[in-house]
Amino acid sequence: MPQGKPSVVPDDGLTTRQRRQRALVVVHTGEMKGKSTAAFGLALRAWNQGWPIVVYQFVKSAKWKTGEEAALRALDRLHAETGEGAPVTWHKMGEGWSWIARPGTEADHAANAREGWAQVKRDLAAQKYGFYVRDEFTYPF
């Protein structure tokens, strides 16, 4: 393990700080639990760095209360009161979805997914945020 010095220094003309600030796309995939938890853990780190955060939840209904939403909304309030961290914007894109299909709901889910993805594209084009969480966006597609 290197002791504070990289074994190879990239010849890209960038400083270490510039390399650390580059945009990344991180995709968590796999079966079972942990993907959303990992994404929200990264969102906490982004908040601490002062990066404005946006969350798009494609599956969970606005009626459903979740711990991750409560925590990040509390951090958004803390930011508004103290200036610490960063603002957090939250979009719930669906009416709720489950593995049990109800007849007549497929079109609604598809329309919500299309509108949700259009919102993501608008926000990406505007470069409004420093950190984007697209939670469970592959399911509706």
Where on the chain are the PLM-derived regions?
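Extreme N-terminal, non-catalytic leader segments
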Residues: 1-25
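Conserved P-loop
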Residues: 23-125
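Loop/turn-to-beta-strand initiation segments
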Residues: 128-131
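Walker B catalytic acidic pair
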Residues: 135-137
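Conserved ATPase-coupling elements of RecA-like P-loop NTPase cores
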Residues: 139-141
